[in-house]
Amino acid sequence: MDKQLIAERFAKARNTYTREALVQQQVAGKMIRILTDVLSSAEHLLPEEIAVRFRHIVEFGCGTGSYSRILLHTLHPETLLLNDLCREMEECVGELCSTQTAGRKKDGTEIRVSFLPGDAENFDFPKGTDLITSCSTLQWFNNPETFFLRCHHALTKDGILAFSTFGTKNMHQIRCLTGHGLYYLPIEELQALLSPYFNILHAEEEIVPLSFATPQAVLKHLKQTGVTGTEKRMWTRGRLQAFCEEYIRQFSSPPTGNVTLTYHPIYIIAKNKE
């Protein structure tokens, strides 16, 4: 996978991402609800005890910071390390790295937020981390199993790995019509890769269809969210026309004639094994 190309596409989309990435924002909200609900149930923790549980947090693939802000306001960690492949994302989360913006915990302790650019697959995150988490990022990784092992070593003995990614039906319309797209792991395979190092506390998936007036609107949406990161072919007039005609023929819905783009989010909460 061309990580440099992926970073460039997301850098170009950083000013439109928050407006266009509605599914990813919904996923971020659901991710934190699942995390707090699962911990409340599995460890019988009250909301204020969950915040104490996660003193040191790492978020990989923070992007423009939608999930980062939810983490800060919900969990109030002592430290939050934000990572993204795209260095330009520091512009989007820079205000969070200010102690005035990040705020203080209830006991008066300052919340320290920092940004680390680069490929999370190559990093050794700080030892003693309580929570490693992410939304809508893991699908860009070349070797998730090796990354899970690195997380296992970085987390405390009862630390949590909580992430969302996308499953095999994600954007299947684009793959069908172009023959191109990411290789998405099924939820069962993700659990199998995690199982040597983690106990799975929760795993679920869902299908989220989006409706667009035209195939051109689908392509604009993809460009403005940066998720065209692996597509290198140019769109000629003939290729675009053929794509649009087939999209309408195969994926339009009566009576509106709108076309559908499918998202397939997966959510996993896993507890570190000793």
From Swiss-Prot:
Record EC number: 2.1.1.197
GO biological process, one term: biotin biosynthetic process
Name of the top EC class for this enzyme: transferase
Catalytic activity: malonyl-[ACP] + S-adenosyl-L-methionine = malonyl-[ACP] methyl ester + S-adenosyl-L-homocysteine
Signal peptide: none
SUPFAM superfamilies: S-adenosyl-L-methionine-dependent methyltransferases
GO molecular function per UniProt: carboxyl-O-methyltransferase activity; malonyl-CoA methyltransferase activity; S-adenosylmethionine-dependent methyltransferase activity
Top-rank lineage group of the source organism: Bacteria
Keyword Amino-acid biosynthesis carried by entry: no
Biochemical pathway: Cofactor biosynthesis; biotin biosynthesis
Keywords: Biotin biosynthesis, Methyltransferase, S-adenosyl-L-methionine, Transferase
Coiled-coil regions listed: none
Family to which this protein belongs: Belongs to the methyltransferase superfamily.
PANTHER family registered for this protein in UniProt: ARGININE-HYDROXYLASE NDUFAF5, MITOCHONDRIAL (PTHR13090:SF1)
Function: Converts the free carboxyl group of a malonyl-thioester to its methyl ester by transfer of a methyl group from S-adenosyl-L-methionine (SAM). It allows to synthesize pimeloyl-ACP via the fatty acid synthetic pathway.
Name this polypeptide is given: Malonyl-[acyl-carrier protein] O-methyltransferase
Taxonomic source organism: Bacteroides helcogenes (strain ATCC 35417 / DSM 20613 / JCM 6297 / CCUG 15421 / P 36-108)
Gene responsible for this protein: bioC
